[in-house]
Amino acid sequence: EDAYFLAWTTTPWTLPSNVALCVNPDENYCKVKAADGYTYYMAEALLDKVLGGMAEKLVKEEKIAEGTPAYEILETYKGKELEGKEYEPLFEGTKEYVAKLPQKGHYITCDSYVTMSDGTGIVHIAPAFGEDDANVGRKYDLPFVQFVDGKGDMTKETPYAGLFVKDADKPVLVDLEKAGLLFDAPKFEHEYPHCWRCDTPLIYCA
């Protein structure tokens, strides 16, 4: 199928460790043909916010005519109906690594923690990093992929070996954009835990 799950994250450095995507089972999701010509899956409640902004940008860049609809809804589903649907991972190295593990990865999971307040209503899951991710990982018996060492540096299984995780954010985004896999990278402020003594960013590792 020539379509993309439009997922989001505030921690790009965790994307090489991605093993699943998560939707809210009770929310509505749509398969849409967007003004940029691509077909996406995302939450119905966030269509105007995400795709409307993209259409405005395309008009300013004179890539589409003013008045062009931001999207056309092709199909609508409950999140639960997407459960188990598989997708191609962003990084080939991750795909090869997970293929050697006994657990299946890279499919849609469901959990009520996914909200409609930000993003696309589809959340990236890396069970090695983050409490919600770890809970979903246990619930679905997902592969455990941890491409970060004890010093907080990316490991050799990634193209970012030796980089501190937060320093890997930008290279990850650059590589995804080159591969045509980055929809947007908006800058916004959000809370992130830091050490109270040395003020360095903390990493949640399961």
How would you describe each model-predicted region?
Residues 1-16, 28-30, 36, 84, ...:
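Residue patterns forming the tRNA-binding/recognition surfaces of aminoacyl-tRNA synthetases
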Residues 17, 27-29, 35-149, 177:
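Catalytic alpha/beta core of large soluble enzyme barrels
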